[in-house]
Curated annotation (Swiss-Prot):
Keywords: Acetylation, Endoplasmic reticulum, Membrane, Phosphoprotein, Protein transport, Transmembrane, Transmembrane helix, Transport, Unfolded protein response. Disulfide bonds: none annotated. It comes from Pongo abelii. The modification Phosphoserine is found at residues 201, 226. Residues 32-69, 116-122, 167-170 are lumenal. This is Derlin-1. InterPro entries: DER1, Rhomboid-like_sf. One of its GO terms (molecular function) is signal recognition particle binding. Homotetramer. The four subunits of the tetramer are arranged in a twofold symmetry. Forms homo- and heterooligomers with DERL2 and DERL3; binding to DERL3 is poorer than that between DERL2 and DERL3. Interacts (via SHP-box motif) with VCP. Interacts with AMFR, SELENOS, SEL1L, SELENOK and SYVN1, as well as with SEL1L-SYVN1 and VCP-SELENOS protein complexes; this interaction is weaker than that observed between DERL2 and these complexes. Interacts with NGLY1 and YOD1. Does not bind to EDEM1. Interacts with DNAJB9. Interacts with RNF103. Interacts with HM13. Belongs to the derlin family. The chain crosses the membrane at residues 16-31, 70-89, 95-115, 123-137, 155-166, 171-189. SUPFAM superfamilies: Rhomboid-like.
Length: 251
């Protein structure tokens, strides 16, 4: 048990709380401590009955059963693996910026879920984070099942197809990929690659709550040091290789 505790405490803070909630909420529903009917995102209940907790519980809940258990475990692994890599890589020392990314993606997913009557939001949020990681490491070669190897930029779409095979749907994965692309475009590609303005900015109260560590940069739209060095070497303009500044290690 001490080994499990040590492993759990080694997970970076934001990923640790997200991971714990994604384990605890399905367990609560499975044990019947709270009826799963209160954990789904139902637009009518949220909008007209003021059951304001539903967007939160729907983000962590997943109906685990004989037909869904494997899909749940696979996505739980994706959450742990890629959120940890983002939090300790591109967002290292900047917990407020990482939390803001999660909040931005979550709000977009909730709005989409209400519009499209999506009852579960766990997979879309996980996929949005995985998509951002894949774009920041787009030229890294990753390994998938059965020894297949390809560039990281294709990983979200490979997983979309994989989840379709084992789960029978692609809507959740597609929404997650699109939301992740929206964040990546507004945060990195548009201001840094296309010379546009910054549309995203982490609120100051998040910096007061989660101050940057080790001299981390405050404020979105300012690239991590490794990307700035790559841009400087390319003359500070034009297109550049997104993956080189964000390699987080070999898969």
């Amino acid at each position: 048990m001490s080994d499990i505790g040590d492993w759990f405490r080694s997970i970076p803070a934001i990923t640790r709380y997200w991971f714990a909630a994604t384990v605890a909420v399905p367990l609560v529903g499975k044990l019947g401590l709270i009826s799963p009917a209160y954990l789904f995102l139902w637009p009518e209940a949220f909008l007209y009955r003021f059951q304001i907790w539903r967007p939160i519980t729907a983000t962590f809940y997943f109906p685990v059963g004989p037909g869904t258990g494997f899909l749940y475990l696979v996505n739980l692994y994706f959450l742990y693996h890629y959120s940890t890599r983002l939090e300790t890589g591109a967002f290292d020392g900047r917990p407020a910026d990482y939390l803001f990314m999660l909040l931005f993606n979550w709000i977009c997913i909730v709005i989409t879920g209400l519009a499209m009557d999506m009852q579960l939001l766990m997979i879309p949020l996980i996929m949005s984070v995985l998509y951002v990681w894949a774009q920041l490491n787009r030229d890294m070669i990753v390994s998938f099942w059965f020894g297949t190897r390809f560039k990281a930029c294709y990983l979200p779409w490979v997983i979309l197809g994989f989840n379709y095979i084992i789960g029978g749907s692609v809507i959740n994965e597609l929404i997650g990929n699109l939301v992740g692309h929206l964040y990546f475009f507004l945060m990195f590609r548009y201001p840094m690659d296309l010379g546009g303005r910054n549309f995203l900015s982490t609120p100051q109260f998040l910096y007061r709550w989660l101050p940057s560590r080790r001299g981390g940069v405050s404020g979105f739209g300012v690239p991590p040091a490794s990307m700035r060095r790559a841009a400087d070497q390319n003359g500070g303009g034009g297109r550049h290789n997104w993956g080189q500044g964000f390699r987080l290690g070999d898969q």
